[in-house]
Amino acid sequence: MDIIPYASAIGSIMDAMLCTRPDIAHALSVTSRYQADPGLEHWKAVKCILKYLRRTKDLLLVYGGNSLKVEGYTDSSFQSDVDDSKSNSGYVYTLNGGAVCWKSSKQDTTTDSTTEAEYIAASDAAKEGVWLKKFITDLGVVPDSEEPISLYCDNNGVIAQAKEPRSHQKSKHVLRRFHLIREIVTRGDVAVERVPSEDNIADPLTKSLSHIVFERHKGLMGIKHIGDWL
């Protein structure tokens, strides 16, 4: 594998992902973990991403929704990493019908429940929401920018814990730094709200999905074929 340009390919894929392709964020997050010592199967996975990008080179992010409003979505897998059983976080924020910022990453701590994994993911997403809210407020072009940004989550336990003023028995083992989300919610920067799992468009940033579900979420992130837009 010494002559395989694995790191170079990962860098090229990252350029595409950061600019316009949130749909490959999860695949990149997984394959980039093996840059130090990639195997043949890892290289095959990277080539699959490159082939997918070539096949879908006419896709672009489209902003043309009905309202100029920022909305966030957060989700996580549970102990999905095959090497250390850590979970994967993902979030995406949309504005005017298209994704404006997104992230897919492995969590740095092992969780023992889906609620804990999703709580950690929501905390990460909420911190990004704080920066995004300040940015759009300073721009002065988004109506109601002083209102909390809606951050949608499909886990009722996460929503309840995010609104708790103090830690309790169920969350005492969660690292304290993740409870920052409570301060963010109390301050009014972000409001954590419920969304059905099938409508959570952060799902593709955390796990592999069926083709139909993946394509639907991709469209809801604003990723369209250029032929459908022109």
Positions of PLM-derived features:
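Conserved pre-motif C helix in the palm subdomain of viral-like polymerases
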Residues: I3-A25, S77-S80, N88, T115-W131
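Conserved helix-loop functional segments at active or binding sites
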Residues: R55-L59, Q79, A99-C101, F135-V141
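RNase H-like nuclease fold core
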Residues: I13, Y73-T115
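RNase H-like nuclease module associated with reverse transcription
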Residues: Y34, S67-K69, S87, S105-L230
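Conserved catalytic core of Hanks-type protein kinase domains
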Residues: A16-C19, Y52, T94-N96, D124, ...
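Structured nucleic-acid-interacting core domains from mobile-element enzymes and related host factors
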Residues: K51-T74, D144-S145
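Conserved active-site beta-strand-loop modules that form the wall/rim of enzyme catalytic pockets
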Residues: D58-L60, K69-E71, G90-V92, G98-A99, ...
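C-terminal reverse transcriptase regions that engage the nucleic-acid substrate
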Residues: M1-L59, P196, P204
